[in-house]
């Protein structure tokens, strides 16, 4: 194993560790907070988090073993199962992000009718469709024996070893990426650009009110005026930064792998194995970044984390106080005798 392989193995180990901790923390927040569970986005977050954890526990370790051993890390049946999960979880992750963007769009563009349009039942229906859509492709690949170990990515994933099936496999793979990656990307762009448009409209209204107030308040201190203008500037940039993060992480994590798969199918140019594994690692890194992008940085999840930490520390302090009380009573008893 050379330095490249060691670096890729280290990247995978780090991704596994961060993904387990962050997604596990999101699950704890969902279990702890009834307020979060009552909201429709909680179902999308739960679906995304469970998929990320399953990918972290099954697919990432097998890819790590493939990178270290430079060969298929498990038997054919286990590898086919892992390839089935890899295909399903990739599509499910992309479609779940599209569902979350639709929820944000409805919440921002139709705030008064949001509760009527996005109920828990509607969210459950969207999750069920996501599963059905995502299951279609691995089920078809399993029936056509297009699941196995792919040496270029050191992973159990979609692959075809028969040259006579190359065209059919290329069409199938293109359809899979078009109906998962491209479809989700189009939905993300449409919904978040609508959200950005509404956010900028509200910012303009607030800016007009702010400027009118500053004009009327002649005796206002210059430092207060500067703070108002700085807050106005931050308000303009806040929505743009968030939406850029949502779409940017999606592209950075998934686009290299999807493009590599398509270039592999439709080009005769050789692709380096290290780049293949790196593109797969980038796709895996989405599982580690999702909790921060969609959950843990939000106010409700931060509050739930604080409550969990307070509960843990309170239990420890009560336990230590109890132990101190027991030792104190043991020291007093012999004296009273």
Swiss-Prot record:
Orphan receptor. Displays a significant level of constitutive activity. Its effect is mediated by G(s)-alpha protein that stimulate adenylate cyclase, resulting in an elevation of intracellular cAMP. Pfam families: 7tm_1. Disulfide bonds join 79-156. It comes from Mus musculus (Mouse). InterPro entries: GPC_Orphan_Receptors (IPR051880), GPCR_Rhodpsn (IPR000276), GPCR_Rhodpsn_7TM (IPR017452), GPR26/78-like (IPR049579). Belongs to the G-protein coupled receptor 1 family. The gene is Gpr26. GO terms for cellular component: plasma membrane. GO terms for molecular function: G protein-coupled receptor activity. Exclusively expressed in the brain. Prominent expression is detected throughout the entire neocortex at all rostrocaudal and dorsoventral levels. Strong expression is detected in olfactory and auditory sensory areas. Residues 32-47, 103-123, 190-245, 298-337 are cytoplasmic. The chain crosses the membrane at residues 11-31, 48-68, 82-102, 124-144, 169-189, 246-266, 277-297. This is G-protein coupled receptor 26. It is found in: Cell membrane. It is a multi-pass membrane protein. Residues 1-10, 69-81, 145-168, 267-276 are extracellular. It comes from the Eukaryota. The lineage of its organism: Eukaryota, Metazoa, Chordata, Craniata, Vertebrata. GO terms for biological process: adenylate cyclase-activating G protein-coupled receptor signaling pathway. Keywords: Cell membrane, Disulfide bond, G-protein coupled receptor, Membrane, Receptor, Transducer, Transmembrane, Transmembrane helix.
